[in-house]
Amino acid sequence: MKYQQLENLECGWKWQYLINKWKDGETITKYIDSSEADHAVSELRKLEHEPTKVLEWIDLHMAEELDKKLKQAIRGKRKRHFNAEQIHTKKKSIDLDYRVWEKLSTRANELGCTLSDAIEYLLSEASRSEKASAAVSTLKEDLSKLLSD
């Protein structure tokens, strides 16, 4: 599915991505010499409020091995941005313990579905089980009343 590209917004994302990589200690420039790399990074840091100039910086200074990763990150960010606009495509996140995720993942694989579908299935099964249990309890009560009379 294609999503509209918004230059200013995406340039800001690219700037943020590069700064985060730099803060994490990764090499973001194509320069081997540390003084050239430091100078290029300081130029990038000055471009925070001039997003369209980030593209020029990328063409001039960015390490080639980062190009594919940057494009993938921006593509994912663009998808999440546009999907967040509509309630039915908006993603929610939950924290799971590893063992819970592992059990859920195994169950989803058994069912041949996604994790979300597996959760939905398990909830509907639990609801159905509760209703059946309540019906059995009611029958037991009614039967015990009949027998005690």
From Swiss-Prot:
Belongs to the MatP family. GO terms for cellular component: cytoplasm. GO terms for biological process: cell division; regulation of DNA-templated transcription. It comes from the Bacteria. It is found in: Cytoplasm. InterPro entries: Arc_rbn_hlx_hlx (IPR013321), MatP (IPR009390), MatP_C (IPR035375), MatP_N (IPR035087), MatP_N_sf (IPR038339). Keywords: Cell cycle, Cell division, Cytoplasm, DNA-binding. Pfam families: MatP, MatP_C. One of its GO terms (molecular function) is sequence-specific DNA binding. Required for spatial organization of the terminus region of the chromosome (Ter macrodomain) during the cell cycle. Prevents early segregation of duplicated Ter macrodomains during cell division. Binds specifically to matS, which is a 13 bp signature motif repeated within the Ter macrodomain. Its main location: cytoplasm. It comes from Vibrio vulnificus (strain CMCP6). This is Macrodomain Ter protein. Homodimer.
